[in-house]
A protein has these predicted regions:
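C-terminal/domain-edge helix-coil "capping" segments
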Residues: 4-10, 14, 38, 49, ...
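Terminal, non-globular segments
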Residues: 14, 18, 25-26, 31
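Short amphipathic alpha-helical segments that mediate assembly, nucleic-acid/protein binding
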Residues: 19-24, 36, 53
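Amphipathic alpha-helical elements of HEAT/ARM-like alpha-solenoid repeat scaffolds that form extended
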Residues: 36-43, 75
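Residue-level detector of alpha-helical secondary structure
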Residues: 40, 44, 132, 136, ...
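Long amphipathic alpha-helical scaffold segments
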Residues: 46-150
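Surface-exposed short loop/turn segments
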Residues: 133, 137, 145, 150-224
């Protein structure tokens, strides 16, 4: 085969429908906060393959919605539901522990289409609910004070059948906040997941946190922030109300510390990281003598060599 034939796009094998689907799915699942609809629209026009597009969308949207922990309003306006793996009952049903309701979700449209009461099997015992409800109440107050457009939820992810003291159980507290301002060319989100283990045998409560911050600025450029942080803390096992106050205080402290560290690192970015990216000396290891550039007259050197 000639070189011309190798470079000819017509001679190159086209992507299969499955390959197109996988590529489209990757772009959709990696969309910046609040931008998946716009990216889906562009992908649809580029693919020109409706089957591959529909397959990619049906797989990518649920993953994106759970990863970004999007918040959807319940159809009866009794509250909101966070789309998380902790509240996932099946592919389209998600539990809202606060209202004891299960929402049916259309992932692609990102709306709740139906709601039903949660069954007893889907809810924790009254003993666990005391701890879950107390923490949820404290977390709601913290999120309202800290995040202008934030939502939170607390789930029992282990030991929901525990009837009383003497056994261990685990809660998961999630916080999701986002700000979408495409007219100002910026979108961002904050997500934090807190696994809280109540160890009755040790009379201790252990906290493990995973924090993620995403931001996208795209005015006359394309700048993205993707920052992650993990942390741990612990407190003593107390009453539901006292545990809730202590846990929320630890969450507040850890999140404020991380935000302060982010602000400090990016404030110093121009004077540290960006400066280090520049080559301190050219490849000749000699500074260019800008004060005496006449000695580098190209015209004069050429004339001398040619004897002009």
């Amino acid at each position: 085969m000639s070189e011309e034939e190798e470079d000819d796009p017509q001679q190159q094998a086209e992507l299969t429908s499955k390959q197109k689907q996988d590529i489209a799915k990757w772009f959709l699942t990696n969309s910046p906060p609040g931008e998946i609809h716009c990216i889906a629209k562009d992908i649809r026009s580029i693919l020109s393959d409706e089957d591959a597009y529909n397959a990619a969308v049906s797989e990518a949207y649920p993953l994106y919605n759970k990863s970004h922990m999007i918040c959807l309003e319940l159809p009866n306006r009794t509250g909101d539901v966070l789309i998380t793996t902790f509240g996932e009952i099946d592919e389209i049903e998600y539990l809202d522990p606060r209202t004891c309701q299960v929402a049916t979700v259309n992932h692609v449209k990102q709306v709740c289409t139906n709601v039903r009461p949660a069954t007893d099997e889907e809810l924790p015992t009254s003993f666990i609910e005391e701890f879950r409800g107390a923490l949820d109440a404290e977390l709601v107050k913290y999120v309202a004070e800290t995040y202008p457009k934030g939502s939170c939820s607390v789930y029992c992810i282990s030991g929901k059948d525990v009837e009383g003291p003497g056994a261990n159980f685990e809660l998961a507290a999630v916080i999701s906040a986002s700000r979408h301002s495409p007219q100002n060319f910026c979108n961002g989100s904050w997500r934090s997941i807190w696994n809280i283990e109540f160890k009755d045998d040790l009379q201790v409560v252990e906290l493990r946190g995973k924090l993620q911050v995403d931001a996208h600025y795209f005015e006359e450029g394309n700048v993205q922030l993707d920052a992650n942080h993990e942390c741990k803390d612990n407190t003593i096992f107390q009453s539901p109300e006292d545990c809730a106050v202590s846990i929320t205080s630890m969450i507040c402290h850890q999140e404020n510390e991380y935000m302060a560290s982010l602000e400090a690192s990016y404030t110093n970015l121009p004077d540290t990281t960006f400066k280090d990216l520049r080559r301190k000396l050219p490849v000749t290891r000699t500074l260019f003598p800008w004060h005496n550039t006449l000695q580098f007259s190209l015209t004069r050197d050429i004339a001398k060599e040619l004897g002009i």
